[in-house]
Amino acid sequence: MITVSIVVPTYRRPKLLTNCLKALLLQKFDKWLYEIIIVSDGPDEETKNVVNNWVGYEHPQMRYMPLPEKKGPAAARNYGWLNARGKVIAFTDDDCTPDPHWLRELVKNCNPNQDVALTGKTIVPISKHPTDYEQNTAHLQTADFITANCACTKNALIKAGGFDEQFSMAWREDSDLEFKFIDNNIPIKKVESAIVVHPVRNSPWGVSIKEQKKTMYNALLFKKHPRLYRKKIKQTRPLLYYCIIAAFAIMLVGIISRAHGVAFVGFAGWLGLTSSLIFKRLYATRLSVSHISEMVATSFVIPFVSVYWQWYGAVKYRVLFI
């Protein structure tokens, strides 16, 4: 009888998924008591082929469930747990490697007949001199609750309402679920012995600019949980971004009005504040020519892009959030 269901959302990342599945197949847990549900966020032949290589052979309880169209990881996880047979639902991601004892430790600390959630220990290996992107990803190690390494009873998910599919990117959907657990008085237990390794994926040059789009979901999370957002979410650099934009605007006004003194003050402020952002991002990171040039170039763009997406989210979700 299935007692626990592992849900793994994925989409067109067969190599990463393969490594994750290898780790899940090595769990020190009776293979007849757990199922693995791989949910593809849309039609995905490569993922289907990867799963079919193992279905009924390496693991008797593995299922592939594609969404009819791409809706985001929150929707994929919902589809998975709603079709799960276990009373306990464990979540991890396709780019993660669960420790062989991961599932056993989660189940050992979870009463399937209670409304309870669990969060494990996530390890993000980074180099001695990491990139800015690696350093940001490493923050997952100190996060309170992330879907890369968590579990809960199915009843707890039902009570909390599952994942909010408005979070259509991989950002803040796990915080939203955590806050809903808190609002519904569902305890969240930390299980240090349930370990997942979350390697940092290779990222393209300038990835930090693309990442700014996720900030629009900060507005949605704030609208739904203003008290918990203020208490638990640390805002990074918004004041600095606004100051940079203000200095840039002063420079433009000075140029347009031919007020050279005003233009110079604005230029000096913009350049100085942007330089401080560059140095903050380079602190304790890799000082290669490629990385330094990336930090310099993207730091001139990020304040404008970040504030744009933050305001976009505020307008879209109709909330005062700056």
Q: Model-predicted segments: where are they?
A:
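Catalytic donor/gating beta->alpha subdomain of glycosyltransferases that bind UDP-sugars
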Residues: 164, 169, 175-230
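Short aromatic/hydrophobic "clamp" motif used to bind/position activated sugar donors
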Residues: 89
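Acidic donor-binding segment of Leloir-type glycosyltransferases
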Residues: 22-66
